[in-house]
Amino acid sequence: MNISVLASGSRGNCTLIHDDNNAVLIDMGISTRKLKQALAQLHLNIEDLDAIFITHEHIDHIRGLKTLTKNYNVPIYSKTATLKQIAITQKFTDINLKKLPSTYN
C-alpha cells in the first residue's frame, strides 16, 4: 500500500491511498486539473479512483469536489451531517454521495 499526500494545508488537502488494484482519495481540496497532474505523476488517472472519502466539509477539503463530480462518477463517502452540509453549501444535486455506516466490522 502507498500513501501519497497530493496537497496539504489551508489551500487544499488531498491524500491518495493506493496499491496495484485500488485507489482511494481522502478529501478533494484541490482542483480537478491539479488532481489529474498529481495522479499522472503516479501513473494513474481519475478513472482509477474507487472512492473519495471526505473527512469534513471545510472548503480546503472539498474545493474541487463539485467540478470532479460533474465529469466523473466516483462514489463519495462521508458522515451524514457532512454530506448534508456539502449538498447545501455546494448546491450538489444528482451526485454519487454515500453515507458511511455508523459502525465498522
Model-derived segments and spans:
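Conserved beta-strand hairpin/beta-sheet module of binuclear metal-dependent hydrolase folds
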Residues: 1-42
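Active-site metal-binding motif and surrounding structural segment of the metallo-beta-lactamase
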Residues: 33-79
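Metallo-beta-lactamase
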Residues: 80-105
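Generic structural signal for residues in well-ordered beta-strands
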Residues: 3, 76, 95-97
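Short beta->alpha hinge that forms the Motif I/post-I loop of the SAM-binding pocket
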Residues: 28, 78-81
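A generic structural signal for short beta-strands and their flanking turns/coil linkers
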Residues: 13, 22, 48-50, 72, ...
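A generic "binding-loop/recognition-motif" signal
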Residues: 11, 31, 58, 82, ...
